[in-house]
């Protein structure tokens, strides 16, 4: 099946009581929630997050009110008795995201790396990183003040406007994040109260209370520097879209399939403390916009609808899309369409009066709604950590004012336009280096930017940071009776083309199901399989060819018919049948139904392939991959790598959060169950929406250890866990609730015999490395390790560039060993990690993360996207999700 983009939302809870009471379940109008930005064309990691000034700006609500006539945007009620003298201390707002992780010192408990965490293996190379050293920073203590509003103001812009009325009292040298104020000099009093006036003459009391002093290098102070730096984008006329800033000045326009596309150039930045210095990390980001409103999309889809139920077809295509509202540059995910309401309907304002959506947008945003009879889009906003159990209030949007983002299915299937988009967004190392150099020079040359940074004595080096790296040797790969290595591109497909598999499984009782239109492709598949399996060592009997109607039910009914006798005899279908389904197209509902049946009710190793895939010129190569996948799903193995460790179980954990359909979150757990790393145990844990920490790890680990003991007749000595899918700010919780709990459980089994290492894997990072050759820049070769300069003294961490990319700039992966009772040396853990990147059976090449991590991702994704329930346990020892 075609790749389906993985989506993930991570947010931070913010608890603050509003002066208005929410109506239970009442939908609200647009602009009132922090939202997930749409997937970007170029895979860019999440930017460093400062505490944003606002979580839910005050906006009109459809079942009650919220809009007033505030300063520039909306107003507030007159303060009542509750706005009297406020004597209780203001609540300290916690720092969020990555800044929480910076204060977690995990290295201090690992004595074996107390003096040094730097390895020595490999060939030394000199690299450049997209980091720029801070060469000047404040040397004075800064003063943090908490800021509170009565009545509470949720709109970040309005909070800033009201505070700015008193700017002469605290001066130009200040940084405000919406909740707290950082000053270079203290106020005369620890606590002050100021009165501000909104545009409609309402009075708001602002209480400013001293919180603490901050040293220039404290994580909280660094957070303010990031907020300050983001101000520079506004001075450069960049527009904020989601969390990042983009410019329209260099927009690239394309037109395909009746849709105009626009690519905006932007940047992701962060200022953080590393081993020897504070640096500014800057990377290029792109935002893809369709010059098409949601209303245009609804009209076009309605005109092209092929079914009688036009509304259902429009809803199915629009749900899950990301739209941009240009009046506030926010992005929203469409969760539903309210066909019963239109812009002429009314909602209640905060003063109890009613206003239509048309009038609201004209008054508040100067937007004119010309189409009266259009439905309203419904967005549920974004769930936040700590508040996943609370009911979210829907946000209502007008389609005419919502601009579509991302790519349509028609565009995605057009190779020429995808290639054209990649040309503009997948920047080569040379182009990326040049673009970033231009950006840094622009900052340096802009007078307003210089003046802003000089207020805080901040100055950045304009040269890319130079860092040493080491290139490790590729792992020894054993297949058949031969040992091979990956080539310079991290691939060994040529080297193993005619070699037998390490452990080939016979293919005897198997079925090929196909629709009438796919008969030719089915016969071709059968013939190719017979020719490609012999060199692999797979013995194969002729398949039973079964023609079906092509809909999901016809596939399932046929499978039920063929498996019923086996089930009635009390036998497992897993031992009898293997299935290949040729699908007429890539309809997701058909695929999901078939996979759900074959992974839950009737567990059978299965492979689904779209007819169009078998029509390609390289059909034989594709069939070879199908045969290899089927071999793995039946319990076989393609190759193994030499790890030089004894009796060690490797575990991968990853989480999938289905934020499109608001389904449960899925944690995938995959563990090796033999010493050669060729057998695996897989289990998933279904959790609450947005939950990242896995609660049932002990159960998963026990089951995996039981399978290991069955395969090896004894327990492993060590367990090494690679944990992916963790958001910023979760490091301490991960250490307490997963790493230490697993260690405690292992001690209950055998207090002295088990050792554990727990490694956090992070793919979504902004750091890039360049290898310079003369005046040119290239990607570092696979196996490049960086464990100095851009690592942290408090962590046992390192980067590895494990994969090779044909287009664009390679993204390294960051590893952080947060718990280790094994005593892994830097060279050992780096070499092991790189070796495991050779063990993903879907590709004869090196991948970006260790194989157990990627297996866990594939498992969680299949369950979260297609199955939506726990797979049958009889499949747990098979890689059925490849």
Curated annotation (Swiss-Prot):
Residues 32-46 have a biased composition (Polar residues). The keyword Cytoplasm applies. It is found in: Cytoplasm. GO terms for cellular component: cytoplasm; nucleus; P granule. Residues 1-91 are annotated as: Disordered. Residues 293-406 form the PAZ domain. Keywords: Cytoplasm, Developmental protein, Differentiation, Meiosis, RNA-binding, RNA-mediated gene silencing, Spermatogenesis, Translation regulation. Gene3D superfamilies: 3.40.50.2300, paz domain, Ribonuclease H-like superfamily/Ribonuclease H. PROSITE patterns: PAZ, PIWI. It comes from the Eukaryota. One of its GO terms (biological process) is piRNA processing. Residues 578-868 form the Piwi domain. GO terms for molecular function: piRNA binding; RNA endonuclease activity. Expressed in testis. Residues 1-15 have a biased composition (Basic residues). Belongs to the argonaute family. Piwi subfamily. May play a role during spermatogenesis by repressing transposable elements and preventing their mobilization, which is essential for the germline integrity. Acts via the piRNA metabolic process, which mediates the repression of transposable elements during meiosis by forming complexes composed of piRNAs and Piwi proteins and govern the methylation and subsequent repression of transposons. Directly binds piRNAs, a class of 24 to 30 nucleotide RNAs that are generated by a Dicer-independent mechanism and are primarily derived from transposons and other repeated sequence elements. This is Piwi-like protein 3. It comes from Homo sapiens. The gene is PIWIL3.
């Amino acid at each position: 099946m075609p790749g389906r983009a993985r989506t993930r939302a991570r947010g931070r809870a913010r608890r603050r009581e509003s002066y208005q009471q929410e109506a239970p379940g009442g939908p609200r109008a647009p602009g009132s929630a922090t939202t997930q930005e749409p997937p970007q064309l170029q895979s860019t990691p999440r930017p460093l997050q400062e505490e944003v000034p606002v979580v839910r700006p005050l906006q009109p609500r459809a079942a009650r009110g919220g809009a007033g006539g505030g300063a520039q945007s909306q107003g507030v009620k007159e303060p009542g008795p509750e706005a009297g003298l406020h004597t209780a201390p203001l609540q300290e707002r916690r720092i969020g995201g990555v800044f929480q992780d910076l204060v977690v010192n995990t290295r201090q408990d690992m004595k074996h790396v107390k003096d040094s965490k730097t390895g020595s293996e490999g060939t030394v190379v000199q690299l450049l990183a997209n980091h720029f050293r801070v060469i000047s920073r404040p040397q004075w203590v800064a003063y943090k003040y908490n800021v509170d509003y009565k009545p509470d103001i949720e709109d970040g812009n309005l909070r800033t406007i009201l505070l700015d009325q008193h700017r002469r009292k605290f001066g130009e040298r200040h940084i405000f994040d919406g909740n707290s104020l950082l000053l270079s000099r203290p106020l005369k009093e620890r606590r002050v109260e100021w009165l501000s006036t909104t545009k409609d003459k309402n009075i708001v009391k602002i209480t400013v209370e001293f919180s603490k002093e901050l040293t220039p290098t404290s994580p909280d102070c660094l957070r303010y520097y990031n907020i300050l730096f983001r101000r520079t984008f506004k001075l450069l006329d960049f527009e904020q879209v989601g969390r990042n800033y983009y410019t329209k000045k260099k927009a690239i326009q394309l037109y395909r399939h009746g849709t105009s596309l626009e690519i905006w150039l932007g940047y992701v930045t962060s200022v953080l403390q590393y081993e020897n210095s504070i640096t500014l990390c800057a990377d290029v980001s792109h935002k893809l916009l369709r010059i098409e409103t949601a209303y245009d999309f609804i009209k076009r889809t309605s005109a092209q609808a092929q079914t009688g139920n036009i509304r259902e077809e429009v809803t199915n295509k629009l749900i899950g899309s990301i739209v941009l509202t240009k009046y506030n540059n926010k992005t929203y995910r469409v969760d539903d369409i309210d066909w019963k309401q239109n812009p002429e309907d009314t909602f209640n304002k905060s003063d109890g009066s009613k206003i239509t959506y048309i009038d609201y947008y004209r008054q508040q945003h100067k937007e004119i709604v010309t189409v009266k009879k259009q439905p309203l889009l419904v967005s549920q906003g974004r769930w936040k950590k700590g508040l996943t159990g609370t009911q979210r209030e829907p946000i209502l949007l007008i389609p005419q004012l919502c601009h579509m983002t991302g790519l349509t299915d028609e565009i995605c299937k057009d190779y020429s336009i995808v290639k054209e988009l990649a040309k503009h967004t997948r920047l080569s190392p040379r182009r990326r280096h040049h673009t970033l150099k231009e950006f840094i020079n622009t900052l340096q040359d802009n007078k307003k930017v210089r003046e802003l940074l000089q207020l805080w004595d901040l100055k950045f080096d304009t040269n890319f940071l130079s860092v040493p790296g080491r290139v490790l040797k590729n792992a020894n790969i054993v297949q058949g009776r031969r040992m091979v290595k990956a080539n310079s591109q991290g691939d060994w497909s040529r080297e193993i083309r005619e070699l037998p598999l390490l452990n080939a499984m016979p293919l005897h009782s198997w079925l090929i199901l196909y629709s009438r239109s796919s008969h030719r492709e089915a016969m071709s598949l059968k013939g190719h399989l017979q020719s490609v399996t012999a060199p692999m060592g797979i013995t194969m009997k002729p398949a039973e060819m079964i023609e079906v109607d092509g809909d999901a039910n016809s596939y399932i009914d046929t499978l039920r018919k063929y498996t019923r006798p086996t089930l009635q005899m009390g036998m497992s279908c897993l031992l009898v049948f293997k299935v290949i389904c040729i699908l007429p197209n890539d309809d997701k509902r058909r695929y999901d139904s078939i996979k759900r049946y074959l992974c839950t009710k009737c567990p059978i190793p299965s492979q689904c392939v779209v007819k169009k895939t078998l029509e390609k010129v390289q059909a034989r190569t594709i069939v070879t991959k199908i045969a290899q996948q089927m071999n793995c799903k039946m319990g076989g193995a393609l190759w193994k790598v030499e790890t030089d460790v004894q009796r060690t179980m490797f575990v991968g954990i990853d989480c999938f959060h289905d934020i499109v359909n608001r389904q449960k979150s899925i944690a995938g757990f995959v563990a090796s169950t033999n010493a050669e790393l060729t057998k695996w145990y897989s289990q998933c844990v279904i959790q609450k929406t947005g939950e990242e920490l896995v609660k049932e790890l002990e159960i998963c680990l026990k089951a995996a250890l039981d399978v290991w003991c069955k395969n090896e007749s004894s327990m492993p000595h060590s367990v090494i866990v690679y944990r992916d899918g963790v958001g910023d700010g979760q490091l301490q919780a991960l250490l307490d609730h997963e790493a230490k709990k697993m260690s405690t459980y292992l001690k209950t089994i055998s207090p002295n015999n088990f050792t554990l290492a727990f490694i956090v894997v992070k793919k979504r990072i902004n750091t890039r490395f360049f290898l310079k050759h003369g005046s040119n820049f290239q990607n570092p070769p696979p196996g490049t390790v960086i464990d100095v300069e851009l690592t942290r003294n408090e962590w046992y961490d390192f980067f590895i560039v494990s994969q090779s990319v044909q287009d664009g700039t390679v993204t390294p992966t960051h590893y952080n060993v947060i718990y280790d009772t094994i005593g892994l040396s830097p060279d050992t853990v780096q070499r092991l990690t790189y070796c495991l990147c050779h063990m993903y059976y879907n590709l004869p090449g090196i991948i970006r993360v260790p194989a157990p991590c990627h297996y866990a991702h594939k498992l969680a994704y299949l369950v979260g996207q297609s199955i939506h329930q726990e797979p049958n346990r009889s499949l747990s020892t098979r890689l059925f999700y490849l």
